[in-house]
Amino acid sequence: MAGAAVTAAIAAQPRRPIKWPAQAMIHVWLDPRTAPPGAGALVDRALRTWNAAAGGRFVLRKEGSSASASVRVRFAQADGIYGETSPRIDGATGFIGSADVLIAGDLAGDATQQRIVIYLTALHELGHALGLPHTDAFDDIMYSFRRPDDGARYFGAYRRRLRSAEDIGSERATGLSPADVAALQSLYDG
């Protein structure tokens, strides 16, 4: 889902984990001009999902203004990708200082499929904005999505777990694997 920008940034610092400072209040802004209808609620669900997984190690908070936001989420034509995240590391502290998240807004499929793709892509890209790298485990939201059909297979597997579209991003269908939660908590406990 993510492009080379986040992978290179995370790989460039093998000695020190890339993350936000302890107990950070991370302000997230969603560009309303670019968001498809209903996308804001799905991004909100992704924020709540990561907040629950963090258990107070940080707080992602929706912000009404881009000027005071550390993470900016925008939607755009995807050109073959679902999303991309570009974190910026603060040279003085070594912590993430800000991140730009881009999510595909031009999606095919029925309304439920579009909601699934937006939610899971937001969850994946926000995971990168928090400092999580790709994994090789298909069940993880941070899976690397290397094969051409990985996205369709992953989104299809998630859809089969839903009882209805209202389950998207619910406690019953967070989209996070136990390994995703463990990786996040380990990153912020270290």
What are these regions, as identified by a protein language model?
Residues 138-190:
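Extracellular (secreted or membrane-anchored) zinc-dependent metallopeptidases
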Residues 1-38, 47, 84-92, 176, ...:
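Disordered inhibitory propeptide/activation segment of secreted metzincin zinc metalloprotease zymogens
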Residues 20-35, 96-105, 160-167:
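Acidic/histidine-rich, surface-exposed loop or edge segments in extracytoplasmic proteins
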Residues 39-140, 146-150:
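Metzincin-family zinc-dependent endopeptidase catalytic domain
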